[in-house]
Curated annotation (Swiss-Prot):
<dbReference type="InterPro" id="IPR008268">
    <property type="entry name" value="Peptidase_S16_AS"/>
</dbReference>
<dbReference type="Pfam" id="PF00004">
    <property type="entry name" value="AAA"/>
</dbReference>
<dbReference type="InterPro" id="IPR046336">
    <property type="entry name" value="Lon_prtase_N_sf"/>
</dbReference>
<dbReference type="InterPro" id="IPR054594">
    <property type="entry name" value="Lon_lid"/>
</dbReference>
<dbReference type="Pfam" id="PF02190">
    <property type="entry name" value="LON_substr_bdg"/>
</dbReference>
<dbReference type="GO" id="GO:0016887">
    <property type="term" value="F:ATP hydrolysis activity"/>
</dbReference>
<dbReference type="GO" id="GO:0004252">
    <property type="term" value="F:serine-type endopeptidase activity"/>
</dbReference>
<feature type="domain" description="Lon N-terminal">
    <location>
        <begin position="12"/>
        <end position="255"/>
    </location>
</feature>
<dbReference type="InterPro" id="IPR003593">
    <property type="entry name" value="AAA+_ATPase"/>
</dbReference>
<dbReference type="GO" id="GO:0006625">
    <property type="term" value="P:protein targeting to peroxisome"/>
</dbReference>
<dbReference type="GO" id="GO:0016560">
    <property type="term" value="P:protein import into peroxisome matrix, docking"/>
</dbReference>
<keyword id="KW-0720">Serine protease</keyword>
<dbReference type="InterPro" id="IPR027417">
    <property type="entry name" value="P-loop_NTPase"/>
</dbReference>
<comment type="similarity">
    <text>Belongs to the peptidase S16 family.</text>
</comment>
<dbReference type="Pfam" id="PF05362">
    <property type="entry name" value="Lon_C"/>
</dbReference>
<dbReference type="InterPro" id="IPR027065">
    <property type="entry name" value="Lon_Prtase"/>
</dbReference>
<feature type="active site">
    <location>
        <position position="780"/>
    </location>
</feature>
Length: 884
């Protein structure tokens, strides 16, 4: 409560309230975020605790109301300060602030306030300090001089409210006594009206009987929603008679507005239409039937279902079908077996979006490109193709665009690209997972004759998004299988064909549904498992793996902020330098995408979270300075930039924050402690190629490019060839081909003195592909197999810094292979310096980033002899008479 005996200091720090007024006796909660306000609270309240007093001074957006003054820019001692306009309420002046850009209109009168509660917080992730302050208005003051103290203002003030002695003398005034009685009578009448609606006004009635009337005037007015000018007028009312007169007028106005609103409500309720009366009677009849046990809820539910079906916008032929099914349902009892399935079917018909679509906003290609660049780093060609797709949609919205199929390793952003397309088109997005689907019914639905039948995933997805034109992602389309229940890939042929999906027939739905408005996007890790007819209906866009530099940029820009947010941290708690991220990429992850990188970053964040949560120095920063005794709270929000007002619910605690510890900076020691010893080493290739018979190949998998070692050894035997490593038929044939070529050219390769000597005389050859649990197939290991065999027979080691790929023929020609970019990136990840490629793959090098190519020596070859010449230190000299 405002205290007439409070001792007001000569100077007060000034907290500005823009277009809001704090009256004596009122309580507000403010959230200080402005640096100047934060500094004021820090120095004047936080450090002084319960001894601190501040001044709250209204700030105008215009000079329309009240008396104004302009702030000086002098020091706290008053130099350069501006004098208040000697008590003349009508005069006003204005002056630019320090920066000369903004004019601040200060009111000449304010209210001294004390802090009842302080709470300090730190925003994440910025680390900005904020304060939540509960202030109580004490007494009015007049500003005599305003000056600057650092980033905030202070004022020389004089008290305006009466002292205790003056109040005792004024209370004997007959006019004041009459005004007090009139105010209390009006306030009591208001409380009586409010008691009928609110349960909490009893405490207000107690205030009315115990608190002096001159204080009640401010408290009551502070609880009303009135204009800023009226608030200022109340603040300027120093004379008790004037203040009580204005307060009585405002209370009476508030009372009359409540009475008028009640009168209008009663009038409207008394003019119920015939249909409304019938509705009320039916509700009463329903209650009577419930008491008698004669409930017809099911009939009411069927009627509601019929109304829902009428509003679904079904085509005429489907509406006729639905009506027949509805008539059948009405004739059935809820206990009958088919009742539940019929009702579920009709509910599906009513919930499907037959006509409802998402309204597409006008496409802004520039904004779409910026969104793609912001959400996805790199992938230039892929993003360009998406922009082209969106450009065609903008020029011809009804065009049936191609079905895009993003093919690439896991973790390169295939799913998020589809989500970005939906975001650019302002359409809803739905993901249909096809991984492991082997039943055609998952696409077309089950027939209703089966128990537990349900619609297919496409129809069910459309029901969930409630629009007929979403962007639908068919995820992992290469993971579908087939068995006796059918082939889901064949069912997708109808879905992805724009000429057929206009009348898509789900077995459960049993009526045609138009899928032509749906934009389909598919994802896959590999193209090989996708049936050719299905692949022909899609435009394949390959997403290669990321380079180490791209991974670094993605981690710093996207992954680290996301990981910190997911673990409740910020940069003030954990910092991961670029050098450490680079070490994680090089030593702990070797992948095409960034999922393992994110997992390792999450492991570091968890380790930091444990330490932060266990901090012994974690202290509560909330300070309860004085208990809140007032029951009326100002619940309005300040609309200025200095402070933000918020409601304080009765009895609710203000949340506490914790001291901000010094940030934890990740170093190599922490990496090894959290992630363990490095999993990969640049010297791995050199260690494994330390003996003859081992060569380094490059292969492509569904996870991107990889380095594949090939090991060959000889032993006593009968000239047999043994192959291990879970190999497919194609790679087995490549091994047979390689051995045949080496045996035929043994003399030319200086592996035997003459061509008559059999290299396999009394010995067997065993070729092994390490990582035996991983299936391997394809022709691209041909040159690697030849190099391994030549190394074995010549007892020469292959260069450890060289990797190769290429298919070979029986005549020694090197044929082109696929996945060149991913293979080159894999070689770079493993620290390989030289890469041997077929010459006909030179065109594919244009897709490899220039920084990667600059760090590698690319060797293009036409024949296997050139491969051998590059693979061995000092070359592999052939005999001059060599032919073919």
């Amino acid at each position: 409560m405002a205290d007439a005996a409070v001792e007001l200091p000569g100077r007060l720090a000034i907290l500005p309230f823009r277009n809001k007024v704090l009256l004596p006796g009122a309580i507000v909660r403010i959230r200080c975020t402005n640096p100047s306000s934060v500094k004021l609270v820090e120095q004047e309240l936080w450090q002084r605790e319960e001894k601190g007093l501040i001044g709250v001074l209204p700030v105008h957006d215009s000079e329309a109301a009240g008396s104004l003054l302009s702030p000086g820019v002098g020091s706290d001692s008053g130099e350069g300060g501006s004098k208040a306009p000697g008590g003349s309420a009508g005069e006003s002046t204005k002056q630019d602030t320090k920066n000369g850009k903004e004019t601040i209109h200060w009111h000449s009168r304010g209210v001294a306030a004390r802090a009842l509660h302080l709470s300090r917080g730190v925003e994440k992730p910025s680390g900005r300090v904020t304060y939540i302050v509960v202030l109580e208005g004490l007494c009015r003051f007049s500003v005599q001089e305003l000056s600057a103290r650092g980033s905030y203002h202070v004022a020389r003030v004089s008290r305006l409210d009466m002292t205790k002695t003056e109040l005792e003398h004024a209370e004997q005034d007959p006019d004041l006594i009459a005004l007090s009685r009139q105010f209390k009578a009006t306030a009591m009448e208001l409380i009586s009206v409010l008691e009928q609606k609110q349960k909490t006004v009893g405490r207000t009635k107690v205030l009315l009987e115990t608190v002096p009337v001159y204080r009640l005037a401010d408290i009551f007015v502070a609880s009303f929603e009135i204009g800023f000018e009226e608030q200022l007028s109340m603040l300027d009312s120093v004379d008790l008679k004037v203040r009580l007169s204005k307060a009585t007028e405002l209370v009476d106005r508030h009372l009359q507005s409540i009475l008028v609103a009640e009168k209008i409500t009663q009038k409207v309720e008394g003019q119920l239409s015939k249909s409304q009366k019938e509705f009320l009677l039916r509700q009463q009849m329903r209650a009577i039937k419930e008491e008698l046990g004669d409930n017809d809820d099911d009939e009411d539910d069927v009627a509601a279902l019929e109304r829902k079906m009428q509003n679904a916008g079904m085509p005429a032929n489907i509406w006729k079908h639905a009506q027949r099914e509805l008539r059948r349902l009405r004739k059935m009892q809820p206990q009958q077996p088919g009742y539940s399935s019929s009702r579920t079917y009709l509910e599906l018909l009513a919930e499907l979006p037959w006509q409802k679509v998402s309204e597409e906003r006008e496409l802004d290609l520039r904004a779409a490109k910026e969104s793609l660049d912001r959400d996805h780093y790199g992938l230039t060609k892929v993003k360009q193709r998406i922009i082209e797709y969106l450009a065609v949609r903008k020029l011809k919205p009804d065009a049936r665009g191609p079905v895009l199929c993003f093919v690439g390793p896991p973790g390169v952003g295939k799913t998020s690209l589809a989500s970005s397309i939906a975001k650019a088109l302002n359409r809803k997005f739905i993901r249909i997972s096809l991984g492991g689907v082997k039943d055609e019914a998952d696409i077309r639905g089950h027939r209703r004759t089966y128990i537990g039948s349900m619609p297919g995933r496409l129809i069910d997805g459309l029901k969930r998004v409630s629009v007929s034109n979403p962007v639908m992602l068919l995820d992992e389309i290469d993971k579908t299988g087939s068995d006796v229940r059918g082939d889901p890939a064949s069912a997708l042929l109808e879905v992805l064909d724009p000429e057929q999906n206009k009348t898509f027939n789900d077995h459960y739905l049993n009526v045609p549904f138009d899928l032509s408005k749906v934009i389909f996007v598919a994802t896959a890790n590999r193209m090989q498992p996708i049936p050719p007819p299905l692949l022909d209906r899609m435009e394949v866009i390959e997403l290669p793996g990321y380079t180490p530099e791209e991974k670094l940029k993605i981690a710093m820009k996207h992954l680290i902020p996301r990981v910190l947010e997911q673990h409740g941290l910020s940069s003030t708690y954990l910092q991961i330098p670029e050098a450490m991220v680079r070490l994680i990429i090089e030593r702990y992850t070797r992948e095409a995408g960034v999922r393992n990188l994110e997992r390792n970053l999450a492991a570091l964040a968890r380790a930091a979270a444990v330490k932060v949560a266990e901090q012994d120095s974690a202290l509560r920063l909330g300070k309860e300075i004085q208990p809140i005794t007032t029951t009326l709270l100002d619940s309005r929000l300040a609309d200025g930039g200095e402070v933000e007002m918020e409601v304080i619910p009765m009895g609710q605690d203000i949340s506490n924050t914790y001291e901000n510890p010094s940030p934890m900076i990740v170093d190599e020691a922490m990496l090894e402690k959290v992630l363990g010893p490095p999993r990969f080493d640049d010297s791995e290739a050199a260690d494994r190629v330390a003996s003859p018979g081992v060569s380094v190949g490059l292969v492509w998998t569904s996870f991107g490019g990889e380095v594949q070692f090939v090991e060959a050894t000889a032993m006593v035997g009968k000239g047999d060839l043994h192959l291990t490593g879970q190999l497919g038929d194609v790679i087995k044939e490549s091994a047979q081909l390689a051995l045949t070529w080496v045996r035929a050219r043994a003399a030319d390769l200086n592996l035997s003195p003459t061509s008559d000597i059999n290299l396999l005389e009394s010995r067997d050859i065993h070729i092994h592909f390490p990582a035996g649990a991983v299936p391997k197939d394809g022709p691209s290991a041909g040159v690697t197999l030849v190099t391994s065999l030549v190394s074995l027979f010549s007892h020469r080691k292959v260069r450890a810094d060289t990797a190769m790929t290429g298919e070979m023929t029986l005549r020694g020609l090197v044929l082109p292979v696929g996945g060149v970019k991913d293979k080159v990136l894999a070689a770079h990840r493993y620290g390989i310096k030289r890469v041997i490629l077929p010459e006909r793959n030179m065109k594919d090098l244009a897709e490899v980033p220039a920084p990667i190519l600059s760090g590698l020596e690319i060797l293009l070859v036409k024949r296997i002899e050139e491969v051998l010449d590059h693979a061995f230190e000092g070359g592999c000299p052939l005999r001059p008479h060599s032919k073919l």
